[in-house]
Amino acid sequence: MRFTTIFWISLTVLATVRAEDGSHAQNEVQAGDGSHVQNEVQVGSEPQTQDSIETPKPTIKYIDFGDLTLSPSASSPAKRNVTLPPDTTMRPDPRQTEPPTEAPTPASTPAPTPDPGPWVDKWIGHDQVKPFPQPEPVTISEKAGVKFKPQIQIRTGCEPYPAVNEYGETGGGLKTTGKSRGNCGGSGYGSQVYGRSTWIRGVWAIMYSWYFPKDSPSPKMGHRHDWEHAIVFIDNPEVSEPKILACSVSSHDGYKKYNPCPSWVIDGTSLKVRYKHAWPLNHDLDATGDGGKFQDSIMWNQLTEDARRALNSVSFGKANTPFNDGKFMPKIENAWPF
């Protein structure tokens, strides 16, 4: 039997009982002769004045709902005992607030790079310096540096040598004794051309530099070490087909400037230069129509930190490094051909 059915039956019984209690109660009063007189006494009426008749209290009829039990039904299924796996963790009830996620530990600030102090020169034999292999160009300036790399022809004097290696060790050069080309006919490790580039007045300038162990047109003449360089001025390295606008080549303390570069000194995108001397003057460069040799190129930003520090600090005597931080822009300004 459902709970609702029991509830309504109980209400009906209770209403019936109250109705009977509210009706006229019949009471029997014994007369003085022993006969019985049946009187109707209305509940709630004035009591009899002749004889005090005690009205019996109505019998209270009720149902104790505490003894009722509910039968399971489809709408209220019976409780079932559910067995949980032994590794199940029950959350406390009421549920506790989850602790906040801890903030990640901030990365420690790296210690500042200590000052390496002044550069200490590291000289090695001129024929012991290993060149940098030409790296694959990545940036626009690096690609332009390879595209416009010049070629050099050696008429007299030394072949170009690498000046510095990855550790910052620099070639010690040669004395001016002996023949102009004595002991400097070429490095067994290969040679090097150094590049550096920049914008100047809306034109892209690329400087290419070569190092020679000595500059000696004749025995006992000249000096240890020599640097020579050429500068190619192009319109814009970012366009698909950049063009050479002008060129300048180092000549003693100045430049030979060509605006525009003669077509006969350009091989595709390569400027042709010659290393020569006019006795008794020292060696210098000039543009030429003759082809020359290429060397592995390395741009300034592709050098190691030690190599750049060495080139910024080492004194090559009467020869100065044209593309280091102190000389590069002044040289570009002096070579301006427009």
UniProtKB/Swiss-Prot annotation:
Describe how expression is induced or repressed: Expression reached the highest levels at 3 days after inoculation of pepper leaves, followed by a gradual decline.
What does the UniProt entry say about where the protein is found? Secreted
Offer a single GO CC term for the protein: extracellular region
- The signal sequence is 1-19
The record, for InterPro entries, names: NPP1 (IPR008701)
Instruction: Give the domain of life.
Output: Eukaryota
Does the entry annotate any disulfide bonds, and if so which pairs? Answer: none
Going by the UniProt record, its keywords in alphabetical order are:
Glycoprotein, Secreted, Signal, Virulence
Q: Which of this chain's residues carry glycans? A: 81
A Pfam family it matches = NPP1
Q: Where is motif Hepta-peptide GHRHDWE motif II found?
A: 222-227
Q: Does the keyword Lipid metabolism apply?
A: no
The reply to whether Signal figures as a keyword in the UniProt entry is yes
In this chain, composition skew of type Pro residues spans: 101-117
Description of its domains? Key residues/motif important for the effector activities are degenerated in most NLPs, including the nlp24 peptide consisting of the conserved region I (11-aa immunogenic part) and conserved region II (the heptapeptide GHRHDWE motif) that is important for phytotoxic activity.
Q: Per its database record, what is this protein's job? A: Secreted effector that contributes strongly to virulence during infection by P.capsici. Causes large necrotic areas in both host C.annuum and non-host N.benthamiana.
Assigned protein family: Belongs to the Necrosis inducing protein (NPP1) family.
Protein name as it appears in the record: NLP effector protein 6
